[in-house]
Each structure stands twice: as structure tokens, then as C-alpha cells.
Amino acid sequence: GGGLLGNLERILNKRYSFLLERKNLFSFNIKLFSYLMKQANLTEREMLKTFNCGYGMVLIIDNNDLQEVSKILNKLNQKFKIIGKLKSTSGDPEVLVV
């Protein structure tokens, strides 16, 4: 449980927070998630804490590996997109929508 935010928070260690790019939220099916948000009267944050928002899997990889991982995913006909990045933190790890 915990939706996309909860899933991302669980994999963070104490040194990093995750910056989730707002422009990529719900992008696999914006109409569906906008409809759900409106019908359920949910905020963006509540949506992200409740649903995975179309993301079946999140890979966190080193930027140096992006080209190779992209090649592999393309070869497997897997759709993917970059949805954010890690940021060093001295506080508690968290997911921030930016």
C-alpha cells in the first residue's frame, strides 16, 4: 500500500530524497486519473498516496547506466520514462513533488 509515494519512500535510504517531477504525474493516462481525482474529491498528494498512478515499476539507476538500461527496455518493448531523480539529504528521506 501507500501508492506511488509510499512505494518510493520505502526504497529510499537515509541519505536521499526523491524529486518526483510533476510534469510526469499521471502521464500514462491523464484523463483517467483526472477523472478519479475529481470524482473522489482527492488532492494530488492523496492520489499519489492511494494509487500507483499507472507506474507498474520504478527503477532507480545511476545516471551513467541510463543509455544501457534504455537500450534493454526498448529491446523488450517496455515503455518507460524518467519521472524524477534522487537528491542527497541530511534530514529524513522523503518524496517531494517538484
Language model features with spans:
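Glycine-/charge-enriched secondary-structure boundary and capping motifs
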Residues: G1-V98
